[in-house]
């Protein structure tokens, strides 16, 4: 059976999970502190409903380097209106077991008031428009191309009217 079934995806996912789950006795408390307390407080403080005019949902968030979407519940609890997350790692966004889109779909089913969230493959080292992203990232799906155009515009001279209240970039700069 192994000769007839392509198992490369399974092994890739296992290898990927090992990287993300790698913790040591020294690193675990620091990781928990950073993910649990620091990130939560930043998100609640700067994206929370108290920052809006009416105190209800309202902040529009652009998340640079959203990875696997590990913070989307924090944004839900902060009561954001909408969220756009982008990351150059296609696998981190589309991983069926633990990717950002999978997490979003699961949470949207559980919580009917979960905000609208979009995820796309894009690279922050290039200008955020269709033309530059296509040249920088290269191959991408038609859906991703459409979202790129809808969210950031077709070229650097014609941007969309979409605006964001908060730019979030938690874990991207150290890479």
What are these regions (language model features)?
Residues 58-67, 84:
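Conserved class I S-adenosyl-L-methionine
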Residues 1-11:
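Intrinsically disordered, low-complexity regulatory tails
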Residues 154, 164-175:
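A short SAM/SAH-binding and catalytic strip from SAM-dependent methyltransferases
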């Amino acid at each position: 059976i192994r000769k007839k079934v392509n198992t490369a995806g399974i092994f890739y996912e296992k290898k990927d999970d090992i990287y993300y789950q790698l913790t040591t006795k020294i690193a675990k408390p620091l990781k928990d502190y950073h993910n649990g307390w620091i990130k939560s407080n930043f998100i609640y403080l700067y994206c929370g409903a108290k920052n809006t005019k009416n105190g209800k949902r309202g902040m529009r968030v652009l998340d640079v380097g959203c990875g696997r979407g590990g913070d989307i519940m924090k944004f839900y609890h902060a009561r954001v209106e909408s969220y756009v997350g982008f990351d150059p790692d296609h696998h981190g966004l589309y991983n069926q077991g633990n990717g950002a889109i999978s997490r979003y779909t699961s949470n949207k089913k559980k919580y009917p008031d979960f905000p609208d969230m979009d995820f796309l493959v894009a690279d922050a080292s290039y200008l955020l428009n269709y033309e530059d992203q296509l040249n920088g990232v290269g191959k991408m799906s038609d859906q991703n191309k459409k979202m790129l155009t809808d969210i950031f515009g077709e070229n650097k001279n014609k941007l969309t009217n979409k605006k964001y209240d908060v730019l979030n970039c938690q874990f991207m700069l150290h890479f």
